[in-house]
Amino acid sequence: MRPSRRAPDELRAVSLERGVVKYAEGSCMVKFGDTHVLVTATLEERLPPWLKGQGRGWVTAEYGMLPRATLERTRREASAGKQGGRTVEIQRLIGRSLRAAVDLEALGERQITVDCDVIQADGGTRTASITGAWVALADCIGWMKARNMIKTSVLRDNVAAVSCGIYNGTPVLDLDYAEDSEADTDANFVMTGDGRIIEVQGTAEKTPFSQDEFLALLALAKKGVARLVDLQKMAVA
C-alpha cells in the first residue's frame, strides 16, 4: 500500500493554471499533489553572445526553491553566494527538455527564459517544473503569435515529465516525498507528447534494478506522461 493510498499507476492530483502572473508573457501554476511550482516565461530580444547572427533563438531555464518550500527552512542560495549543484543540474534539465520541443529557427533571434520557483516541495519538483514550464512556454508563444511576432509554428510537440520508482517491491508512478525517501529505485522520465524520450534519470537507491523492472517503470511513465499531456492541452486550449 502506498502512503497516499493511490494505485500503483495513479498520478497525484495535478492542476495546470495558465496566465497566473500579470507581467510575464507566459506563466503557469503547476501542482502535483502537495508539490507546487510557479513558472514564468519571459521573452527577451537578446541572445547569448555565442548565438548572435546565427538566425535562431534560444530557450533557457532557471530553477529555485523558496526557503520554506521544505519542512525546515533552506538557506537562500543567493545569500550563500552560489547555486548548488542540484539547482544547476535541474535548471539545465528543464532547458534541455524545452528546447527539444521548440523550432529555434522559427523562434528567431530571441531568447525565452523560463523561471521555475518551487513554492512547496513534496517530491517531484523537477518533473512538475518541466510539465508546467511547457505550459508557460506555450503561453508565451501564444502571446507572440497574437502580436504577429512569429508566423510559423514554434512548438513541435508537448513535453511533460514524471517520476517512477520501485516502492516496497512494486513499480509506482509519480512518487511523493514519503515514497521517494524510501524507494528502492527512482527515476525521472521526460517525454514528448507522441511518446518519444527526451531524458531518463534513474538511480538504484538501495538495490540494483533489472531490465524488466526498468521496462515496467517506462510503461508507467508513458501512461503518466500521456495523461499530463492531455492536461497540458486542456490548459492551453
From Swiss-Prot:
Matches recorded under Gene3D superfamilies: GHMP Kinase, N-terminal domain
Keyword line: Nucleotidyltransferase, RNA-binding, rRNA processing, Transferase, tRNA processing, tRNA-binding
Classification via SUPFAM superfamilies: Ribonuclease PH domain 2-like, Ribosomal protein S5 domain 2-like
Annotated EC: 2.7.7.56
Reaction(s) catalysed (UniProt annotation): tRNA(n+1) + phosphate = tRNA(n) + a ribonucleoside 5'-diphosphate
InterPro entries named in the record: ExoRNase_PH_dom1, ExoRNase_PH_dom2, ExoRNase_PH_dom2_sf, PNPase/RNase_PH_dom_sf, Ribosomal_Su5_D2-typ_SF, RNase_PH, RNase_PH_bac-type, RNase_PH_CS
The keyword Kinase appears for this protein: no
Keyword Nucleotidyltransferase in annotation: yes
GO biological process terms held by the UniProt record: rRNA catabolic process; rRNA processing; tRNA processing
GO molecular function: 3'-5'-RNA exonuclease activity; tRNA binding; tRNA nucleotidyltransferase activity
Cross-referenced CDD domains: RNase_PH_bact (cd11362)
Pfam families: RNase_PH (PF01138), RNase_PH_C (PF03725)
Similarity field: Belongs to the RNase PH family.
Role, per record: Phosphorolytic 3'-5' exoribonuclease that plays an important role in tRNA 3'-end maturation. Removes nucleotide residues following the 3'-CCA terminus of tRNAs; can also add nucleotides to the ends of RNA molecules by using nucleoside diphosphates as substrates, but this may not be physiologically important. Probably plays a role in initiation of 16S rRNA degradation (leading to ribosome degradation) during starvation.
Quaternary structure and interacting proteins, as annotated: Homohexameric ring arranged as a trimer of dimers.
Record HAMAP family: RNase_PH
Name of the molecule in the record: Ribonuclease PH
Native species: Nitrobacter hamburgensis (strain DSM 10229 / NCIMB 13809 / X14)
Gene that encodes it: rph
